[in-house]
Amino acid sequence: MLFHNLDGFGSHCGFRLFSCIKDGEFGQGMHFPLLICISLEELLAKFGDRPIRLSTANTYSYQKVDLPFQEYVDQLLEPQDLDSLGSETLYFFGDNNFTEWGSLFQRYRPPPFRIPGTTGAYSFGIAGSGSGVPFHWHGPGFSEVIFGRKRWFLYPPEKTPEFHPNRTTLSWLLDTYPFLPSWERPMECTIHPGEVLYFPDRWWHATLNLDTSVFISTFLG
């Protein structure tokens, strides 16, 4: 079920739950402090006039569009249009301006894990219900939901999923997923506010925002 609702955004503070994939299964580990407690009103007051860079929500996202954050929230932060391709859908995730948005990132405490000799890279985003990115892969990292819920679908590196790179995750879920035999289905989970998912190196994954969601990833390496 998908929801478009920002009520309660910023109200979740406390501790977050770290989850990971180990030996092909999801596991849960330690709790550690959650650090971003912020409302949409506060974000708009501080950053509404600041430009953000949007990407298309497809596997190979080449198109970039810059516009003020306030304009994105007012005009584009809507549920996913079922008739639109991922290559036609603009999505705010990554390409962050760490200078202009520095006060936000300074409030964030990443998961206390890293690859020795490297520094993690942050990607912050806000997106509407039903949006997401279709299957792709990259290096390892952590994904945390601050507000809303994000559903994940994952395959190990050696198992390439059946998908179209320019179609949305929502269309894949409706048109392809129901017809996959059980042995062809991905691992999947839904992460909620204060939960953190570790995604391993080169694992295929697709995401689907079940609500209007605020999220941040820490890419390792």
Region annotations inferred by a language model:
Residues M1-L6, S11-V196, W204-G221:
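N-terminal accessory scaffold of Fe(II)-dependent oxygenases
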